[in-house]
């Protein structure tokens, strides 16, 4: 297929297929970790993935891009810039100075929490598209949605580069559209 | 001054002055924390700061943008995209799957480390501009430079949004140009 005929998503899928680094047994035995660092470090691949994710976020009527700490920052920031939007940094607990709004969530072992500043930013009534690199269990993304809704923001959808099948991730995301750049594996 | 006459840096400085959130005694007593989350969450301010940092990175002949985990990702990713470059995610210890290259550095209390993948990315001979939100002690940025040089990359300079004066940050950065968007306070 000629370069022009390739859609934005095709180019992004090619980049992900070519540059993703696969590492067995990380962070624990039995997990195949998909490291996108080489995708982002390569100009052509990085631009291709950002372009596809921006196209998806625009379809979801994004007014602000929500980036998940920390790998979601690496994609969400560029997508926000391309669309001329702000990027909402959804931080892990303790990273932001008080006062903050906090949303706890269950992990496989124990709990974690996400936070937003409770001053200086007003997301009430805004359409927020949440961006991260991978949809796995969906726990973090689900918590991010609750956090945003607790600040009267509206999550109009999720855009991810890749998805790990079989972990029930989409069940945690509620009735919002989920767009994943790479085809399910 | 009319909108057109304002330089890229003037617009960015206005955005930082207007939107930065100041919080006393965070992360510890006596520290005035400057939270840029509201700057990034506002479309106009975010674009203004990214444009200024991209202008600076271009002056420093960037071939790749190095973003420091995690707030450096929020700026470095957009700057890289604007310049059509890749973004090198310089991660905190343990976040990347092996094999990795590690650079330890001293903290006020204890040590920390930064890591890069030792496969899948080739930065040998490349001009890398390091981007973070704040220049404080310069410890993390100095370690990032050593890490990149250990992979035969070349740090052609640093671009920061703001600088905390009086912490000797520049002493840690070696003989490379440092561009800070906001005027020294």
UniProtKB/Swiss-Prot annotation, chains A, B:
Concerning CDD domains, the annotation shows: PRTases_typeI (cd06223)
Where it mainly occurs, coarsely classed, is: cytoplasm
EC number(s) for this protein? 2.4.2.7
**Pathway(s) the chain acts in:** Purine metabolism; AMP biosynthesis via salvage pathway; AMP from adenine: step 1/1
SUPFAM superfamilies per record: PRTase-like (SSF53271)
Localization recorded for this chain is:
Cytoplasm
Gene3D superfamilies for this protein: 3.40.50.2020
Asked if Zinc-finger is a keyword of the record, the answer is: no
GO function term, MF aspect, one: AMP binding
Q: Which InterPro entries does the record associate with it?
A: Ade_phspho_trans (IPR005764), PRibTrfase_dom (IPR000836), PRTase-like (IPR029057), UPRTase/APRTase (IPR050054)
Q: Name one GO biological process term.
A: AMP salvage
Q: Which reactions are catalysed by this chain? A: AMP + diphosphate = 5-phospho-alpha-D-ribose 1-diphosphate + adenine
Q: Where is the signal peptide?
A: none
Q: Which terms are listed as keywords in the entry?
A: Cytoplasm, Glycosyltransferase, Purine salvage, Transferase
GO cellular component: a single term: cytoplasm
Q: Name one Pfam family in it.
A: Pribosyltran
Q: Does the keyword Ribosomal protein apply?
A: no
Q: What class of enzyme is it?
A: transferase
> How the protein assembles, per its UniProt entry?
Homodimer.
According to its UniProt entry, the function of this protein is described as: Catalyzes a salvage reaction resulting in the formation of AMP, that is energically less costly than de novo synthesis.
- NCBIfam families for this protein: PRK02304.1-3, PRK02304.1-5
The text of the family note is: Belongs to the purine/pyrimidine phosphoribosyltransferase family.
Protein's name in the database: Adenine phosphoribosyltransferase
Source species of the chain: Corynebacterium glutamicum (strain ATCC 13032 / DSM 20300 / JCM 1318 / BCRC 11384 / CCUG 27702 / LMG 3730 / NBRC 12168 / NCIMB 10025 / NRRL B-2784 / 534)
What is the gene called?
apt
